From Swiss-Prot:
<dbReference type="InterPro" id="IPR023631">
    <property type="entry name" value="Amidase_dom"/>
</dbReference>
<dbReference type="InterPro" id="IPR004412">
    <property type="entry name" value="GatA"/>
</dbReference>
<dbReference type="GO" id="GO:0030956">
    <property type="term" value="C:glutamyl-tRNA(Gln) amidotransferase complex"/>
</dbReference>
<comment type="subunit">
    <text>Heterotrimer of A, B and C subunits.</text>
</comment>
<dbReference type="GO" id="GO:0050567">
    <property type="term" value="F:glutaminyl-tRNA synthase (glutamine-hydrolyzing) activity"/>
</dbReference>
<dbReference type="Pfam" id="PF01425">
    <property type="entry name" value="Amidase"/>
</dbReference>
<comment type="function">
    <text>Allows the formation of correctly charged Gln-tRNA(Gln) through the transamidation of misacylated Glu-tRNA(Gln) in organisms which lack glutaminyl-tRNA synthetase. The reaction takes place in the presence of glutamine and ATP through an activated gamma-phospho-Glu-tRNA(Gln).</text>
</comment>
<keyword id="KW-0547">Nucleotide-binding</keyword>
<dbReference type="InterPro" id="IPR020556">
    <property type="entry name" value="Amidase_CS"/>
</dbReference>
<protein>
    <recommendedName>
        <fullName>Glutamyl-tRNA(Gln) amidotransferase subunit A</fullName>
        <ecNumber>6.3.5.7</ecNumber>
    </recommendedName>
</protein>
<comment type="similarity">
    <text>Belongs to the amidase family. GatA subfamily.</text>
</comment>
<dbReference type="InterPro" id="IPR000120">
    <property type="entry name" value="Amidase"/>
</dbReference>
<dbReference type="GO" id="GO:0005524">
    <property type="term" value="F:ATP binding"/>
</dbReference>
<feature type="active site" description="Charge relay system">
    <location>
        <position position="77"/>
    </location>
</feature>
<keyword id="KW-0436">Ligase</keyword>
<keyword id="KW-0648">Protein biosynthesis</keyword>
<keyword id="KW-0067">ATP-binding</keyword>
């Protein structure tokens, strides 16, 4: 018997009542992973021995009835440090790297007796939108194995969508949680920048990166955020704001809530069928008592260009540490120090990572800094101001998560610009440091469509309130792919 259809609260009740043990739940989860892994390829590492050892220790001391997450398995994206468990960032550069410390988000999960079951596949160093740039494997969409799962947190999304695990962690720099959540029909949240500590997250774009949760439902997503969110002295960008309970508004009605619908989010490049689906969702919010009105975010159209200058510039700096000296891959054909650096980085990084390092280095160079990096920062400020103006009058912003549904494997990986444009609607949220969620909102051609809700900083509770209200009157989150046990 599989437990992957049980909610976290249902699993907790079974564990407290001793109808199952943490060890049994872990064993069943490992079986679910193994039985589906060949089809979807969600994991780089499955930490079976460590997970069973941890489960046995939890059983020995007993399940804490007041701790919802006690004994619950968790999958973790492979750019989040896990002590003693390979953390590769899906790169040849770190193919053998075992951290000697846990990321704060992982330490918080361990503190709640969660069980790290394995590390999920991703785009190399989180650079990509399809999980095809991984050094190890290509992950496949849970609904259609000929399609991409999205990225860069593709493995974390498919692990939940396919029923391998109930909960997982990802990271989001320009849409890397929300886009794969949309493509796989699960709930994915990018928290406000600083809400979850970045300590232990392998850095890509330091002013953009944020760790966040995946789950099948809105409430379970909020329950996992309760675990991982914390202020942290080890992260200088950690926010001092701490919400006591992110589930506190779930179940409340949304009558009187004011929701903005940017006209740019239904503009050029958006699939007409996606437009229909999202407009229907807007009508549903109106039926629930909210007001939905059209607004403008005029500078959002520059988001992709701004993002790829800023993110690539930050990446070119952050990735300088990978040089073959301290840890990870080192080229064995080097005759001197210069060759160690050049050969290691040439052989250790994949094409997309090298592309972004070169773009970032160019943008930061003395002759082009003002024209590119400085200008991108100025336009970023305009994007932030656009959001501020809207949130002066509205509680939330609504729109599609992605311009289209999941695309085919190997169709865009040789067209970087087309791949980058898949994040057109998610990138501005990262540039502004705002919270955003993707929830299931329907299907187009048999593939899931994600609805994105964006809030002002630290408005996760309100986002969850609105998302849960929509979820309560729809059944999209209940529909499951065949690999999970559904009929689609």
């Amino acid at each position: 018997m599989s437990f992957n259809h049980k909610t976290i609260e249902e699993l907790h009740d079974l564990l407290v009542a001793k109808e199952i043990s943490a060890t049994e739940l872990t064993q069943k989860t490992l079986e679910d992973i193994k039985s589906r892994e060949e089809a979807v390829g969600s994991f780089i590492t499955v930490s079976e021995e460590a997970a069973l050892k941890q489960a046995a220790a939890i059983d020995a001391k007993g399940i804490d009835a007041d701790n919802l997450m006690s004994g619950i398995p968790l999958a973790v994206k492979d750019n989040i440090s896990t002590k003693g468990i390979l953390t590769t960032a899906a790169s040849k550069m770190l193919y053998n790297y075992e951290p000697i410390f846990d990321a704060t988000s992982v330490a918080n999960a361990y503190a709640k007796d969660m069980i790290v079951i394995g590390k999920t596949n991703m785009d190399e160093f989180a650079m990509g939108g399809s999980t095809e740039t991984s050094y190890f494997k290509k992950t496949k969409n849970a609904w259609d194995h000929t399609k991409v799962p999205g990225g860069s947190s593709g493995g974390s999304a498919t692990a939940v969508a396919s029923g391998q695990v109930r909960l997982s962690l990802g990271s989001d720099t320009g849409g890397s949680i929300r886009q794969p959540a949309a493509f796989n029909g699960v709930v994915g949240l990018k928290p406000t920048y600083g809400t979850v500590s970045r300590y232990g997250l392998i850095a890509f774009g330091s002013s953009l990166d944020q760790i966040g949760p995946f789950a099948p439902t809105v409430k379970e997503n909020a329950q996992l955020l309760n675990v991982i969110a914390s202020s942290d002295v080890k992260d200088a960008t950690s926010a001092p704001v701490r919400i006591a309970d992110y589930t506190s508004k779930i179940g409340r009605d949304i009558k009187g809530m004011k929701i903005a619908f940017p006209k740019e989010y239904l503009g050029e490049g958006i699939d007409p069928k996606i437009k229909e689906t999202v407009l229907a969702a807007a009508k549903q919010f109106e039926a629930l008592g909210a007001t939905v009105e059209e607004v403008s975010l005029p500078h959002s159209k520059y988001g992709v260009a701004v993002y790829y200058i800023i993110a690539s510039s930050e990446a070119s700096s952050n990735l300088q540490r990978f040089d073959g000296i301290r840890y990870g891959f080192r080229a064995d054909d080097a005759k001197n120090l210069d060759e160690i650096y050049v050969n290691t980085r040439s052989q250790g990084f994949g094409d997309e990572v090298k592309r972004r390092i070169m773009l970032g280095t160019f943008s930061l160079s003395s002759g082009y800094y003002d024209a590119y990096f400085k200008k991108a920062g100025q336009v970023r400020t305009l994007i932030i101001e656009d959001f501020d103006k809207v949130f002066a009058d509205y509680d939330l912003i609504l729109g599609p998560t992605t311009p289209a549904v999941a695309f085919g494997l190997d169709t865009l990986n040789h067209d970087p610009v087309a791949m980058y444009l898949a994040d057109l609607l998610t990138i501005p949220v990262n540039l502004a440091g705002l919270p955003g969620i993707s929830i299931p909102a329907g299907f187009v051609d048999g593939l899931p469509v994600g609805l994105q809700l964006i809030g002002p900083k630290y408005a996760e509770e309100t986002i969850y309130q609105a998302a849960a209200a929509f979820e309560a009157v729809t059944d999209y989150h209940k529909q499951q792919p065949i690999i999970f046990g559904g009929d689609k």
